[in-house]
UniProtKB/Swiss-Prot annotation:
Zinc finger (C2HC pre-PHD-type) in chain: 79-112
Segments of skewed composition (Polar residues): 296-305, 340-351, 387-396, 404-416, 428-446, 595-604, 787-816, 1040-1054
GO cellular component, one term: nucleus
Physiological role: Probably involved in transcriptional regulation. Binds to cruciform DNA. In cells, binding to unmodified histone H3 regulates DOT1L functions including histone H3 'Lys-79' dimethylation (H3K79me2) and gene activation.
Covalent cross-link Glycyl lysine isopeptide (Lys-Gly) (interchain with G-Cter in SUMO2), where: K280
Region entry Leucine-zipper, spans: 752-780
Biological process annotations from GO: positive regulation of transcription by RNA polymerase II
Subunit structure: Self-associates. Interacts with FSTL3; the interaction enhances MLLT10 in vitro transcriptional activity and self-association. Interacts with YEATS4. Interacts with SS18. Interacts with DOT1L. Interacts with histone H3; interaction is necessary for MLLT10 binding to nucleosomes; interaction is inhibited by histone H3 'Lys-27' methylations (H3K27me1, H3K27me2 and H3K27me3) amd acetylation; interaction stabilizes association of MLLT10 at chromatin; interaction is essential for histone H3 'Lys-79' dimethylation (H3K79me2).
Name under which the protein is recorded: Protein AF-10
Stretches annotated zinc finger (PHD-type): 22-74, 135-198
Length: 1068
């Protein structure tokens, strides 16, 4: 069940233990609801929980029934008990250990956290120190509940040095919980005090408020007696307000607004006041809404000072903003300026300029609404430490009968009487701003000036006539306006005669609107001018109103433009950047063109220009007062061109002047011939920092004896303006950055750091991999060294005797202690099916060839020589065919073998000695046998050589003279190959010689291809070397064998399986 306003009878429905709660919400105790933060009631049977959406972390309020977490869990009520306090009822949520805890307990015990700050669950209790569970609640002791005093965890009094401990819910029932302004982005801290310190804090707060309000008025002319008189008059005002509400359900355009409005104070807290700005009551406040802070006006006209004082004894002050979410760290309103003075309301009845009853609601730091809209709630971000100033429409006819002739500088809230004088609201970022139909709200400016009396009703009738002519109505219906969320911040200029003027930033997050400068100004001759911009579906207009000696001329914005266009203002002095004042409806601006009213005294003008996108019915305006002929005193406000509007030094008014050509004359000249000429500097209008707003700057005079005196400019150069903009932009961002956002940014930063580290590691690994591959590529790209053969026949020839066709399993499972030093590890001789099928009768046997390097060879020579032998590992010889016409040689270049051979001691093969002399014999000491039984090897005499036909040598003798030594050696070896192939009676020794010489020829394919041998002794070398290209790097593919097919009567075949797979695996 959702309610935007709490029914009065709800307290009767609350269970007995919760009846002591002061408000409706079980978390914040506020009994009010808002459209964006409604009060939601649990529909569970017998459950009386009522919470705000933001207080309980409800992401979306359902349209149907809603159940609290306790009712939703359907757990027995006896089992649901808060782990932090002895109370069972209230708004409970699950904890991380499966128990339950109150949301309010989680908020007020500092160590308790929410795992998810948006849903506010689960409640994490693991950080709560044990000491809190050992404390006893003094409230339970006082009320005779000693058995429950030690239950749960207790919070302590926030007064330094006080050791009183109490349960959060006990303090909530007793009204001892409050909120204090935090430092920095932590805008609100949740505090609780014991009864003694809470009462002391309340008293000191009351006194500090009183002193601060007096400091806003003329401190030299007030006495305490007048203070009490004005308080009494204020109560009379309230009664008249009640009658006024009954008489006026609808605002009327003919209403005469009185310039002086009573500002009703409940709690005025300002951040300039160290004590008064701190205490905020939790029970009646609404400071925990995350999305926006909603300005809300009391729904009853009786909520005046008497009510607030009666409630003040119980510690129930009203606060002017709605709930910020109850999250830790995001508890405050979404952007409060802690450093701006916002409270300008006073407990005094304000003087009226006219004796005619008028109804104006002027807000200085709070938003007030029209009578018919009084029960709905405005949504303004005025969270700048101000409690609700409920401005009641005043009928101030008999206020100052006895003081009509006196000049008393009281704190006046002047409304910038534009349009309907019913609502004067200050908006900054309204999410839902409810204005009644026909309202044109105008924000007001708390100023200190003389109260003027004895103004005749004729003047008021003139004001009525001017109002009817010059002002347009805003026709937004109740509910949210169509305007942008980012609307104008209206800067309030508080001017007092003896105290420094504080330009009050009325909007949270409006850093551009507050800048404290000395301006000891008073209203001269009681004249006040207020320039405001109204935005309505019909159009926008700026209305300037003067109260000067009984005349109330009204100047519209077009007159201002015409005056600027006609040269009344210096083009250098009037810097206007006002691209579009017309509201979002798009209709043209019906502004009237007239002359600038002539005033005998210079006036400070300030224009609050509404955002083009803000079609809200509320008119931000800043009424400014005339400086009291003090040359050199200036009112400065921060530049409002932070987010979109810029300081334009050239008058770019062509568009607006074109719009104002068709406007009408609205008024006559004033009394005197002094024009509103612009010299010196002027306050810049405070515009919204979030919308592309226009910035209108008007310069003004400080006249003395009808002569112009130039006021020194606030910023002498554009550099100073930019520097101020930069610093204030930083301040704005700091103030806008709520702790939840900072927490989210820190989490994102942490995630980015983790991801960055992971990517750096990945890059490091990939770089190392790339370097390894580059090294391997460099090793493999080294050309094979030339194989030098020993021509001397003085070597003993060792040859293997061929093993006669051992079965494949004996080949694959042969275990020899010497195999570890060879290229043939166990199980590394697979027999390919295609070779078995292609040569059906061929049998396979393997020869393990390993030639240790000579003793005198250095390791460098060993490693360099190894690369030439890589192909030994992959050469496989099949059956020799009888015809030998189809000799296909695929001797693979095995990659990555050289690195293994160089790295493994004992596996280093030397090139020297592999290929013998020209007779083709192989010299190699037999060190490794494939079978456990040693192989029988025969010694061939060194001079033993295969016979070479002389015809072959003579046939090729003619080509030998043209060849180099290396080519000659290869040629002779080729001749030997042909001799061997022609004989077709190969012994196992010849098989070995043939194998090695084929391997040697593969190292030099280009030279072999260039050999052109005459005669029939030539062998198809290209066929022998087909498929001898090197495989790609780091890929171990099974290479095809050098298969030489024979018929069924062919000789026994020696066949060596491919080793590239195991070798590459060992390399990787």
């Amino acid at each position: 069940m959702v309610s935007s306003d709490r029914p009065v009878s709800l307290e009767d429905e609350v269970s007995h233990s919760m009846k002591e709660m002061i408000g409706g919400c079980c978390v914040c105790s506020d009994e009010r609801g808002w459209a964006e933060n409604p009060l939601v009631y649990c529909d569970g049977h017998g459950c009386s929980v009522a919470v705000h959406q933001a207080c309980y972390g409800i992401v979306q309020v359902p349209t149907g029934p809603w159940f609290c977490r306790k009712c939703e869990s359907q757990e027995r009520a006896a089992r649901v008990r808060c782990e932090l306090c002895p109370h069972k009822d209230g708004a409970l949520k699950r904890t991380d250990n499966g128990g339950w805890a109150h949301v309010v307990c989680a908020l007020y015990i500092p160590e308790v956290q929410f795992a998810n700050v948006s849903t506010m669950e689960p409640i994490v209790l693991q950080s709560v120190p044990h000491d809190r569970y050992n404390k006893t609640c003094y409230i339970c002791d006082e009320q005779g509940r000693e058995s429950k005093a030690a239950t749960g965890a207790c919070m302590t009094c926030n007064k330094h040095g006080c050791r009183q401990a109490f349960h959060v819910t006990c303090a909530q029932f007793a009204g001892l919980l409050c909120e204090e302004e935090g430092n920095g982005a932590d805008n609100v801290q949740y505090c609780g005090y014991c009864k003694y310190h809470f009462s002391k804090l309340k008293k000191s707060k009351r006194g500090s408020n009183r002193s601060y309000e007096q400091s806003l008025s003329d401190s030299s002319s007030h006495s305490q007696d007048k203070h009490h008189e004005k308080e009494k008059k204020k109560y009379k005002e309230k009664d008249k307000h009640k009658q006024k509400h009954k008489k006026q359900p609808e605002p009327s355009p003919a209403l005469v607004p009185s310039l002086t409005v009573t500002t009703e104070k409940t709690y005025t807290s300002t951040s300039n006041n160290s004590i008064s700005g701190s205490l905020k009551r939790l029970e009646d406040t609404a400071a925990r809404f995350t999305n926006a802070n909603f300005q809300e006006v009391s729904a009853h006209t009786s909520s005046g000072k008497d009510v607030s004082e009666a409630r003040g004894s119980e510690g129930k002050g009203k606060k002017s903003s709605a709930h910020s979410s109850g999250q830790r760290g995001r508890k405050p309103g979404a952007g409060r300026n802690p450093g701006t003075a916002v409270s300008a309301s006073s407990p005094f009845p304000q003087g009226s300029f006219s004796g005619t009853p008028g109804s104006v609601k002027s807000s200085s730091g709070s938003s007030v609404q029209s009578p018919q809209d009084f029960l709905s709630f405005t949504d303004s971000d005025l969270r700048s430490d101000s409690y609700t100033h409920t401005q009641q429409p005043s009928s101030t006819k008999d206020v100052h009968k006895g003081e009509s002739g006196s000049q008393e500088a009281a704190v006046n809230s002047f409304s910038s009487l534009v349009g309907h004088p019913v609502t004067s609201t200050v908006i900054s970022q309204p999410k839902s701003f409810d204005n009644s139909p026909g309202e044109l709200g105008s924000s007001s400016l708390p100023t200190a000036g003389y109260k003027r009396a004895q103004t005749s009703g004729i003047e008021e009738e003139a004001v009525k006539e001017k109002k009817r002519k010059g002002n347009k109505q805003s026709k937004h219906g109740p509910g949210r306006p169509k305007g942008n969320k980012n609307q104008e911040n209206v800067s309030h200029l508080s001017v007092s005669s003896a105290s420094p003027t504080s330009s009050v930033a009325s909007a949270a997050g409006s850093v551009t609107s507050s800048s404290l400068q000395k301006s000891p100004t008073l209203l001269r001759n009681g004249s006040l001018q207020s320039l405001s911009v109204g935005s309505s579906p019909v159009g926008s207009e700026i209305s300037m109103q003067y109260r000067h000696d009984g005349a109330c001329p009204t100047t519209t914005f077009s007159e201002l433009l015409n005056a600027i266009h006609n040269g009344i203002y210096n083009s250098n002095d009037v810097a206007v950047s006002f691209p579009n004042v017309v509201s979002g409806s798009g209709s043209s601006t019906p502004v009237s063109s007239s002359h600038i009213p002539q005033q005998s005294s210079g006036h400070l003008q300030q224009v609050g220009a509404l955002s083009p996108s803000a079609a809200s019915s509320v008119t931000p305006a800043a009424a400014t007062t005339q400086a009291n002929t003090v040359s050199g005193s200036s009112l400065s406000q921060a530049p409002a061109h932070m987010y979109g509007s810029r300081l334009n030094q050239n008058p770019s008014m062509a568009v607006l002047i074109a719009q104002s050509e068709s406007s009408q004359t609205d008024q006559d000249l004033g009394d005197n011939a002094r024009s509103l000429g612009g010299r010196g500097s002027s306050p810049r209008g405070s515009l919204s920092p979030r919308s592309p707003v226009s910035n209108l700057q008007l310069r003004y005079d400080q006249p003395s004896n009808s002569s112009l005196e130039t006021v020194p400019p606030v910023a002498a150069s554009i550099e100073q303006l930019l520097e101020r903009q930069w610093s204030e932009g930083q301040q704005f961002l700091l103030e806008q950055g709520t702790p939840g956002d900072i927490l989210g940014m820190l989490k994102s930063l942490h995630q980015l750091q983790v991801e960055n580290r992971r990517l750096e590691e990945q890059i490091k690994n990939l770089t190392a991999k790339k370097e390894r591959l580059q090294l391997l590529n460099a090793q493999l790209s080294v050309p094979f060294p030339a194989i030098t053969t020993n021509p001397s026949p003085s070597h003993q020839m060792h040859t293997y005797t061929a093993q006669t066709a051992p079965p494949p399993d004996s080949l694959n499972s042969s275990k020899s202690p010497h195999i570890g030093n060879s290229f043939l590890p166990d199980n590394s001789l697979p027999v390919l099916n295609q070779d078995l099928t292609s040569s059906g009768q061929s049998t396979s046997s393997s020869s393990a060839l390993s030639t240790p390097p000579p003793a005198g060879q250095s390791p460098a020579q060993q490693s360099s020589g190894v690369s030439g032998v890589q192909q030994v590992n992959g050469v496989t010889v099949g059956a020799l065919a009888s015809g030998m016409q189809t000799v296909t040689s695929t001797i693979p270049a095995v990659s990555a073998v050289g690195g293994i051979i160089g790295a493994l001691p004992g596996n280093q093969l030397a090139i020297n000695g592999i290929v013998g002399a020209l007779n083709g014999v192989i010299q190699t000491p037999v060190t490794i046998s494939q079978n456990p039984a040693p192989l029988t090897h025969t010694s061939v005499p060194p001079n033993a050589a295969h016979p070479m036909p002389a015809a072959a040598l003579t046939n090729s003798a003619s080509g030998l003279g043209l060849l180099s030594d290396q080519q000659r050696q290869m040629f002779i070896q080729q001749q030997q190959f042909q001799q061997l192939l022609n004989s077709q009676q190969l012994t196992p020794e010849q098989h070995q010689a043939f194998l090695y010489q084929l391997m040697q020829q593969q190292h030099h394919p280009p030279e072999l291809q260039q050999l052109q041998l005459p005669g029939p002794t030539q062998i198809p070398i290209n066929n022998l070397l087909a498929g001898a290209q090197a495989p790609p790097l780091h890929t171990a593919t099974t290479n095809p064998f050098l298969t030489i097919h024979g018929d069924s009567t062919s000789q026994k075949v020696t066949r060596l399986s491919d080793k590239t797979g195991p070798v590459a695996q060992e390399k990787s």
